């Protein structure tokens, strides 16, 4: 099957002398891999655009037996500059892309995943100060977009809207069920994480707003710890991924 699609280059590898394999996040099809035969040499077909973080318009051809896909042509639509020159920003971006690869994205969630990732890269390209929890917040939002969204609106037991204030004893985030319990209600057996008003507001903000606005968030040390525990616990339980020794590992 032949198709044309916009895509973000997630990873590039070399095989044989002049050929490349490329992993893309496509706007319509999600994550795919394709071989770029002659990709190291062909300026006419690929114009030097097969670099990580580049957004391209690509034309792909499937083999007759469906064993692999061959990249026929690619045109550069957009590529970062500052991101490539700042190794800290580069590292944050790579961490986010590795999570995308580890979790995966199919056709159903492709458009939202594509848009979210481009907004994350634009934030890294343009913002003066990178949000310190950006990789964690991106993992949370990407998982939410792929169907793993928890419920932060109200207590899962009594149903009362929850604002996380101290008068009701704070909140507990139930990792397994992805819901909140107020201080007056008992949570079921299972791992829970304390959630303050600050952390709850931040997670709601991330869930509802573009990454381009995440630099507005400001965390206290306590808020950082709570957010990290809640997001890491949720992703480990529901997706089975943990960041270890520079890579995402399946539990």
Curated annotation (Swiss-Prot):
What domain of life does the UniProt record list for this protein's source? Bacteria
Keyword field: DNA damage, DNA recombination, DNA repair
Gene3D superfamilies reported in the protein's UniProt record: Nucleic acid-binding proteins, Recombination protein O, C-terminal domain, Recombination protein O, zinc-binding domain
Gene Ontology annotations of biological process type: DNA recombination; double-strand break repair
The record, for Pfam families, names: RecO_C, RecO_N
Per the UniProt record, which residue ranges are transmembrane? none
Quote a single Gene Ontology cellular component term.
bacterial nucleoid
**InterPro entries (alphabetical):** ARFGAP/RecO, DNA_rep/recomb_RecO_N, NA-bd_OB-fold, RecO, RecO_C
Protein family per UniProt:
Belongs to the RecO family.
Instruction: Name the job this protein performs.
Output: Involved in DNA repair and RecF pathway recombination.
Q: What is this protein called?
A: DNA repair protein RecO
Give the species.
Nitratidesulfovibrio vulgaris (strain ATCC 29579 / DSM 644 / CCUG 34227 / NCIMB 8303 / VKM B-1760 / Hildenborough)
Provide the organism lineage as a comma list: Bacteria, Pseudomonadati, Thermodesulfobacteriota, Desulfovibrionia, Desulfovibrionales
């Amino acid at each position: 099957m032949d198709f044309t699609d916009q895509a973000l280059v997630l990873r590039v590898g070399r095989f044989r002398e002049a050929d490349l394999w490329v992993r893309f996040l496509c706007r319509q099809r999600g994550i795919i891999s394709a071989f770029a035969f002659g990709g190291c040499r062909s300026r006419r077909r690929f114009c030097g655009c097969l670099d990580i973080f580049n957004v391209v318009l690509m034309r792909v051809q499937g083999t007759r037996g469906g064993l692999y896909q061959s990249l026929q042509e690619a045109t550069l639509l957009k590529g970062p500059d500052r991101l490539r020159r700042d190794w800290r920003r580069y590292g944050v971006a790579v961490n986010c892309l590795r999570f995308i690869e580890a979790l995966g994205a199919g056709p159903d969630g492709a458009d939202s995943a594509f848009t979210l990732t481009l907004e994350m890269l634009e934030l890294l390209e343009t913002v003066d100060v990178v949000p310190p929890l950006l990789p964690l917040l991106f993992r949370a939002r990407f998982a939410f977009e792929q169907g793993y969204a928890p419920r932060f609106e109200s207590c899962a037991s009594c149903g009362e809207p929850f604002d996380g204030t101290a008068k009701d004893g704070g909140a507990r985030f139930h990792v397994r069920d992805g819901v909140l319990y107020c201080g007056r209600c008992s949570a079921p057996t299972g791992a829970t994480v304390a959630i303050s008003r600050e952390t709850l507001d931040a997670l709601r903000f991330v869930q509802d707003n573009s990454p381009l606005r995440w630099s507005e968030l400001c965390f206290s040390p306590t808020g950082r710890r709570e957010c990290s525990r809640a997001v890491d616990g949720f992703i480990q339980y529901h997706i089975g991924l943990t960041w270890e020794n520079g890579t995402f590992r399946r539990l």
